[in-house]
Amino acid sequence: MNIKVISYFAIITFSFVLFFLIQGYGSLKKFSFQDDYSAFLASDKPHDLQIDFKYLNASELMLSGKRFFYDEKFKLAIKSFNFLIDKHPDLIDSSVHSFLAESYYELQGKFSSDVTNHIEKALYLNPSDTRALSLQGLNYFQQNNFEEALKSWSIALENSTNNKEKESLIIAMNLALKKLKN
């Protein structure tokens, strides 16, 4: 063999070993997870909850739940968040429950017991969770309880850091005020 070929092979091998020492196997798993998720979304097969979440760690479960949520695949988001709650109960924060509540609401189109239970759990863990407060306000608004809706939305507005969310809350609050005056 040529000395150049041997040196190229040694450089590539050394780079590969160095990558594993610095980045570890976990980074390859992340790439694999992202590739699998992209392939899953691109496939023509119906997404009938045949994903196996047991090989994902807590952060990957949270990421997959959020990605499914934002891709409007609410059944998969619900499955992902529920699996996260079952397997990692000590790592659950209010955002998991508020995403679950909104996923159930989007899927069912109403404030079922699933939605209200997860809103309550989210607000128990974090009384200023803006997603949960926004949903709670919407629930009160649909029940024509405009004063309570305004209370929930005003707390959400105080705690929100997202300008689009603030604009939506202000619009909702103005509508509730108009309904309250009538």
Regions found by a protein language model. Name each.
Residues S59, D93-S95, R131, E165-S168:
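Start-of-helix register in tetratricopeptide repeats
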